[in-house]
Design a protein with these regions (language model features):
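Generic hydrophobic transmembrane alpha-helix motif, especially the helices
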Residues: 198-233
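Transmembrane-helix boundary motif in ABC transporter permease subunits
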Residues: 165-197, 361-366
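Transmembrane alpha-helices
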Residues: 244, 267-305
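C-terminal transmembrane helix and the adjacent membrane-cytosol boundary/short C-terminal tail
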Residues: 246-250, 254, 288, 330-374
Length: 374
């Protein structure tokens, strides 16, 4: 009777857990998948307005729709007060446009033209604006706005922060775990260190964010930057990496160490050739857990990396501030309540985590085969 009741409770708890998981994922997919498109994945988040120079080719001829501009190799349509590029020919001069710094700025479909020379398109009728473009010769200056709504800046920033955080926290955490398991003498000091590590794992991430802001952003003058955010996350990840790696090292049988010493290997050689390769699957778990923590973190990054949707142009400084996918999700819900866009970002996050985990396992498997441990 008691066994049957206990078994029923276990089944009920399992079914409830799995159901909640499927409901959450199903809701995210239902709300998010319709909003995912090529533009969503490849565009910048904010609209970008630029003045460009385009050299019209008067020798180009042809017929097309009402908004066809032969000299530029484009077709425009009427937008909201402006012209919208609807088609671009393969060899269009518009693909050779340059900005005011004489840097290539290829015009694309859906770009909006709001100014032709000194004339604002909103002050012209559609026909007059098209005639103005068709009658233009030589170099033509256009004010072009590229529509946003894409996640590419946040996606790139997320990858940068994942890599930087793991590069810093990985070696430090693994080295600390090796010391605690292989070198440190059992006693009060070791127990105190492990107790401190366990307590660090339980500190709210917003506390790490405040610490990172005070130390990296203000004291070390890094400003809001991906380096400040990555260093803050590195500190946050250390307890997870140390604890998980140490548990993996403990799983290596004592006989492996003794056999290596018996063959004349030093302790360092034993660690490098025997213990670490054997513990690699467990270390991989630490890396996967760390990736999940980084991708899901927002509080610490808001205080250190900032919330600007841009691709960082350095590690520190004004142009190094960047929002990750998670921080952008937070601001979307907070500022505009756009649940659909936030869900679309969540779908991308799920796919990103899966791909990174698969890549980690493939790299580990290849390493184990190469070293003869697979």
């Amino acid at each position: 009777m008691k066994d049957g009741l206990l078994r029923s409770l276990i089944y009920l708890a399992t079914a409830l857990t799995v159901s909640i998981l499927f409901i959450i994922i199903g809701f995210i997919l239902y709300k998010g998948v319709p909003g995912i498109s090529v533009d969503f994945l490849t565009r910048s988040w904010d609209d970008k307005t630029t003045f460009v120079n385009v050299k019209a080719d008067a020798g180009r001829t042809g017929e097309g729709d009402e908004g066809y501009i032969p000299a530029l190799g484009i077709t425009v349509k009427e937008g909201d007060k402006n012209l919208v590029i609807s088609k671009i020919e393969k060899n269009s001069p518009a693909k050779k446009a340059v900005n005011m710094k004489n840097v290539s700025y290829v015009l694309k479909k859906d770009d909006t033209i709001s100014k032709i020379g000194s004339d604002n398109t909103e002050d012209l009728s559609f026909k007059d604006a098209v005639k103005l473009l068709q009658s233009s010769n030589g170099t033509l200056r256009l004010k072009v706005t590229r529509p946003g709504g894409g996640i590419i800046p946040m996606f790139v920033s997320t990858i940068y922060i994942i890599l930087l955080s793991l590069v810093v926290a990985g070696p430090i955490g693994i080295s600390a775990a090796i010391y605690l398991n292989e070198y440190a003498k059992p006693g009060r000091v070791l127990n105190s260190i492990r107790f401190a590590i366990q307590n660090l794992a339980g500190i709210p991430s917003i506390i790490y964010g405040l610490f990172g802001m005070l130390l990296f952003v203000q004291t070390l003058k890094m400003q809001y930057s991906i380096l400040a955010g990555s260093l803050t996350l590195s500190i946050l990840l250390l307890p997870t990496i140390i604890s998980t790696t140490e548990e993996a090292l403990k799983e290596i049988p004592r006989s492996y160490r003794e056999g290596s010493y018996g063959l004349g290997a030093t302790k360092l050689q034993t660690i490098a050739k025997i213990i670490l390769p054997g513990a690699l699957p467990g270390i991989l778990v630490a890396v996967i857990l760390s990736i999940g923590r980084i991708v899901g973190e927002s509080a610490a990054l808001i205080f250190t990396a900032g919330t600007i949707a841009q691709i960082p142009e350095g590690l520190v400084g004004g142009k190094a501030s960047a929002a990750t996918l998670t921080t952008k999700m937070y601001w979307l819900i907070k500022e505009s309540g756009d649940l659909s866009a936030a869900s679309s970002i969540a779908v991308v996050l799920l796919v990103l985590i899966i791909l990174l985990n698969v890549a980690s396992k493939m790299i580990t498997r290849a390493f184990l085969k190469r070293t003869g441990n697979g």
